[in-house]
């Protein structure tokens, strides 16, 4: 967080430059201060602010022209500052809002001809069962959506009351909840519009949904309004109102906004059709898919955190889907007759899926009692709702398939998406000492494009970041961040060949393996470290000791791991020699353009400690490395090597209890020769 308000003032002042004496700069700074509190570091705030791009200055209008338009210019755009457009192309939304106007008539919508033709960046929001929320909570959700709109993220909200289609009053109840959402938004100073006639139901057996006209939706969005759509469809031909699934509405909107709703006719010219679709795609960018559901984020019965904080769909969709289906199949048989030390029942799935020995584990082979899923906290893991969780995950998977890789989704409970989420909901927590305020996951995600908590943090660190002073106060993470993500390639595949010390002292693979693109790996290392690698020296050093390689995506991130012998231990291939080999993280790399976003580092780190080397790994880092804070949070232990500039990290259990293991780790971390061209044979 920031040391003092002047930090954020300086950050904002670097991009907000106004030539007008009438612009409420202090109000703008206060607005950004409240939002950037959702960013955990100054680097994240700077990263967000750096996305503001200056626009080309437009010729100044003469005074008569300005007078004819009926309001004075605020000079936001003219000064080269784009408060929303630099990030989302929506300067008009913020510039046109009453908060930034100085006369009574300024709250009125702009004429259509003045609306910007820049790309419109949209968040598709589905809110489930709003009827379960009181007016105060719904009002705070409306406030968050209003703030997203002010930041240039136009919101299109789909109401999902979850009513059975047999409900006689489904239409009135759906419209009532849509109107409640409208009131909640407008209470916070942003206009909204209910659109209950934009969805058509095809007469085909599949009853596919489509959008009547994209302009009916885009027009209010371009003018800074928030669109609210109830799950009402109209049959083609008869125009009879019928209930439709909110998930299908979200998918129909996604297809329409991506230009995939265009229906080709036999007489269409293919080139003209492609040009038209391309133009439609440039008009709109769906950047976020947001699901607000009382069920919350995707649960996990295999992790100490009880939840999936980040889902890399490319890698994990099938695995998590199977896990949720297992939960659905278990049904009421989830609860066994077994009880923990507190006399509470535990889940059978926990017994059949014990935790792996990974960095998340907090020093015990079995699930700690304070993290067990008991009959008293069944609602916290949503045991009856596995099917709903599967539906939410499937919706994001299907929708993100239509969208570019930069788009992302988030699932959260409505209460955590309110601006009062930092207030303790449980009076018993009032005395708990917390060092960090709870973040609004929607605002945090907008600012950082990351989940509110890192996916590679151990469960104990999640407790600390949640402001919990004891294990018993640990809360399940209610939000799940979802990306289309990237494939993860492991050499060798641990499902086929377990990563273990080589026999006869030689590794079964090298970096010259034809499956490895060595030039791209070298480029990844050099880009990440910003140093030139002595490739031949590096190959000679790791060729006979390579444990494996982890590659994320198209060499966007990766890790090189080796088996190292401590000083004085002969490399004779004996069992004694193999037992002393240390699993060592030689290189942990992420391309500069992927650092701090996309979850690349988390994906690689999780693969290392959960799949490849679950028993532990060690590594070293220079003491002045800015990444050390990230390492400290994920390591089980650290040690500043005396007489050197190195800090040693490890994720292995019992390192401090076994003196020889600790000395082996220290000896390896002291003795590794660097392979950089600037000091290629010098040990620090």
Curated annotation (Swiss-Prot):
PROSITE patterns: GNAT_NAGS (PS51731). Its EC number is 2.3.1.1. The keyword DNA repair does not apply. Its main location: mitochondrion. One of its GO terms (molecular function) is L-glutamate N-acetyltransferase activity. It catalyses: L-glutamate + acetyl-CoA = N-acetyl-L-glutamate + CoA + H(+). Residues 414-439 are annotated as: Disordered. GO terms for cellular component: mitochondrial matrix. Residues 415-434 have a biased composition (Polar residues). It is found in: Mitochondrion. GO terms for biological process: L-arginine biosynthetic process; ornithine biosynthetic process. The keyword Mitochondrion applies. Keywords: Acyltransferase, Amino-acid biosynthesis, Mitochondrion, Transferase, Transit peptide. Pathway: Amino-acid biosynthesis; L-arginine biosynthesis; N(2)-acetyl-L-ornithine from L-glutamate: step 1/4. Residues 505-674 form the N-acetyltransferase domain. N-acetylglutamate synthase involved in arginine biosynthesis. PANTHER family: AMINO-ACID ACETYLTRANSFERASE, MITOCHONDRIAL, N-ACETYLGLUTAMATE SYNTHASE. Belongs to the acetyltransferase family. This is Amino-acid acetyltransferase, mitochondrial.
